[in-house]
Amino acid sequence: WGEWHIKSEDGLVPMPDEAIRDEYAADYLAAFPTAKLLMRRPFNIAAKHQLGLYNDMNGEEKDTMEWLGWIAEGGWYGDEPHALSAMPTFWQDAPVGGEFTSSLSMRDMLGKKLPRTLRLLEASHMSFIGPKTASVKYAKGYNAVLKQLGYRLRVTELKLTPCADGVCAELTVANEGAAPFYWEWPVNLYVEDAAGST
């Protein structure tokens, strides 16, 4: 993901306009043509190129709901009334990333407010979260968060039928996660005998 932080309160120039922002994004798109890139907000270029989005305020309800609002409706960014595009179904084609907010403690997010944290993650269709991690004393909550992330593939049915070369296998796989599997990857099935040989 890429985050742009401009500390204008420290005297730095404000965020450049859309044309300049798009030049930066175009450089990344050219440099990483097969990668799934993410942006902090649903800028128009993110919608145009089906980029993923990134929420750095996970666990904070007000900020996450604002972020989800940008995704649902698009709208203003700074002085630009049409800088953000509505991208309500982007997560079906590109990943959602994020990190836990620094404004709340892990004790809150992974303890007493865990149901809220999980609800916000589910609404976001989050694929990954990092880099901030919880201490081992919050393992139960952290594991619940991990179960809420990304894709969760499982085999729901296996059919074995005789065929000319031995046995043919047909697998049915379900995704029970909050996000799809974004790449077409081949599936390999290995069969072992009792001795562990394939």
Regions found by a protein language model. Give the residues of each.
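Catalytic-core regions of glycoside hydrolase
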Residues: 1-134
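Surface beta-strand/loop "capping" patches
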Residues: 144-194
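A beta-strand/beta-hairpin structural motif
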Residues: 197-198
